[in-house]
């Protein structure tokens, strides 16, 4: 096999998924708290904006790299409040994270019409043309082979199905860019050490963000996977971006 990036380090492709799994297993219990602290709560607003990309909740939705379930559970609550007939599958390769999502769904009484499946984004255990929406938030950056995951997304979506991705991106404005770089590399790992007892995990986080393709480059990757009507929308000056596309 070939070497790939694990943060700024080069590792064998076959080892990368294990390394990432190990990181998320170690920080799973502090994951939600760290998201609030690192983003100063902004991730909640980003996710609220993200779910606006899924207008039809009478749908079959696959949420990949679900983590602790924030996106899927927001959709489940919205559908429940509206009386929609939603069908949700939460999928993550990390069982500890998925177990946290299960617990949250029970605590929030949102477990109806939800399935939890441990699965690899590069090899999804679903039939072709199965879902109306494929959602992934802050997850595709951690997939060893992003192109393979995009092709799997295309495969499992129904014709006219929608791909929606929320991911950290590239800040272009000068002052914000400089501040964001300083905050990412100097503050976030320190918060990770204090709160989660794991500086290394959050060093990986900021390094993986720095290496992720720009908005335009990722748009090209999505299009080359077969999608059409590929667009992105920057939030918070490009700290994150929402990418959307259709299988036509």
Curated annotation (Swiss-Prot):
- A Pfam family that this protein carries is Ubie_methyltran
Q: Which UniProt keywords apply?
A: Menaquinone biosynthesis, Methyltransferase, S-adenosyl-L-methionine, Transferase, Ubiquinone biosynthesis
Give its E.C. classification number. 2.1.1.163, 2.1.1.201
> Record keywords: Cell division included?
no
Query: What pathway or pathways are given for this protein in its record?
Result: Quinol/quinone metabolism; menaquinone biosynthesis; menaquinol from 1,4-dihydroxy-2-naphthoate: step 2/2; Cofactor biosynthesis; ubiquinone biosynthesis
The record's listing under CDD domains reads: AdoMet_MTases (cd02440)
Q: Which residues bind S-adenosyl-L-methionine?
A: 68, 92, 120-121
| GO MF annotations, alphabetized | 2-methoxy-6-polyprenyl-1,4-benzoquinol methyltransferase activity; demethylmenaquinone methyltransferase activity
Which GO terms are recorded in the biological process aspect for this UniProt protein?
A: aerobic respiration; menaquinone biosynthetic process; methylation
Q: Reaction catalysed by this chain?
A: a 2-demethylmenaquinol + S-adenosyl-L-methionine = a menaquinol + S-adenosyl-L-homocysteine + H(+); a 2-methoxy-6-(all-trans-polyprenyl)benzene-1,4-diol + S-adenosyl-L-methionine = a 5-methoxy-2-methyl-3-(all-trans-polyprenyl)benzene-1,4-diol + S-adenosyl-L-homocysteine + H(+)
Q: What does this protein do?
A: Methyltransferase required for the conversion of demethylmenaquinol (DMKH2) to menaquinol (MKH2) and the conversion of 2-polyprenyl-6-methoxy-1,4-benzoquinol (DDMQH2) to 2-polyprenyl-3-methyl-6-methoxy-1,4-benzoquinol (DMQH2).
Instruction: Describe the family membership recorded for this protein in Swiss-Prot or TrEMBL.
Output: Belongs to the class I-like SAM-binding methyltransferase superfamily. MenG/UbiE family.
Q: Report what the protein is called.
A: Ubiquinone/menaquinone biosynthesis C-methyltransferase UbiE
This chain's source organism reads Rickettsia prowazekii (strain Madrid E)
Species lineage = Bacteria, Pseudomonadati, Pseudomonadota, Alphaproteobacteria, Rickettsiales
Name of encoding gene: ubiE
